[in-house]
């Protein structure tokens, strides 16, 4: 049995919220592999996490930009958290970036938290950067990708809400996005497309996460 197949049922267990991290000082001790989800505000991070583990209310969703102000940690239930009984992975819902209506002091605080987490977390196996299929990569996304490249943190692009645009437009977006990633050293070459609402691309995402965790 491969390591991936050993973990294959992990997404269908009960998952729980274990910690919100408002500042870098509140990060939990490094333990299980971490998979983080980042993206512009309201790109669908929380909805995708909920769909990924089939728990509708696990990660909070909101129509208010910047509602997720902390790093939110989720793990499968049933593990004590001791060194002998770590969960096989943790999912991290990161604060949205690119919000225009939030006060500057909050924006600065969230930016400091996110950037310092990305730079210094050795158990962080991969960051999934969520891009709204209707809008493509924006300037704020480019800035985060620059940071990840500089920090040599592996990341992969997910085009979310893929059901909201025509298939030919999605194909064109995938082509242009893949071309733009060729010059980025930390980018994983394969794109993923998902729709949390229609449950599209979730199995492919689960497989990609398991591969990242066991590498």
Swiss-Prot record:
Its cofactor is Mg(2+). InterPro entries: G_ENGB_dom, GTP-bd, GTP-bd_ribosome_bio_YsxC, P-loop_NTPase. GTP binds at residues 39-46, 66-70, 93-96, 160-163, 194-196. Residues 31-215 form the EngB-type G domain. The gene is engB. Mg(2+) binds at residues 46, 68. This is Probable GTP-binding protein EngB. GO terms for cellular component: cytosol. GO terms for biological process: division septum assembly. Belongs to the TRAFAC class TrmE-Era-EngA-EngB-Septin-like GTPase superfamily. EngB GTPase family. Pfam families: MMR_HSR1. It comes from the Bacteria. It comes from Bartonella bacilliformis (strain ATCC 35685 / KC583 / Herrer 020/F12,63). Keywords: Cell cycle, Cell division, GTP-binding, Magnesium, Metal-binding, Nucleotide-binding, Septation. GO terms for molecular function: GTP binding; metal ion binding. Necessary for normal cell division and for the maintenance of normal septation. PROSITE patterns: G_ENGB.
């Amino acid at each position: 049995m491969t390591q991936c197949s050993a973990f294959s049922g992990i997404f269908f267990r009960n998952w729980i919220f274990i910690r919100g991290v408002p500042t870098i000082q509140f990060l939990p001790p490094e333990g299980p592999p971490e998979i983080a989800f980042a993206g512009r505000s309201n790109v669908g991070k929380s909805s995708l996490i909920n769909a990924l583990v089939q728990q509708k209310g696990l990660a909070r969703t909101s129509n208010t930009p910047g509602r997720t102000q902390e790093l939110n940690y989720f793990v499968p239930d049933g593990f004590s958290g001791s060194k002998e009984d770590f969960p096989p992975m943790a999912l991290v819902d990161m604060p949205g970036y690119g919000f225009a209506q939030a006060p500057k002091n909050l924006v600065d605080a969230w930016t400091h938290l996110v950037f310092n987490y990305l730079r210094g977390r050795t158990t962080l196996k991969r960051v999934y950067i969520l891009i709204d299929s209707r809008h493509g990569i924006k300037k704020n996304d480019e800035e985060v990708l620059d940071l990840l490249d500089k920090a040599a943190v592996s990341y992969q692009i997910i085009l979310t809400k893929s059901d909201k645009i025509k298939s030919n437009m999605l194909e064109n977006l995938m082509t242009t996005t893949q071309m733009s990633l060729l010059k980025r050293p930390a980018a994983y070459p394969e794109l993923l497309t998902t729709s949390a609402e229609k449950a599209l691309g979730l199995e492919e995402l689960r497989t990609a996460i398991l591969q990242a965790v066991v590498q």
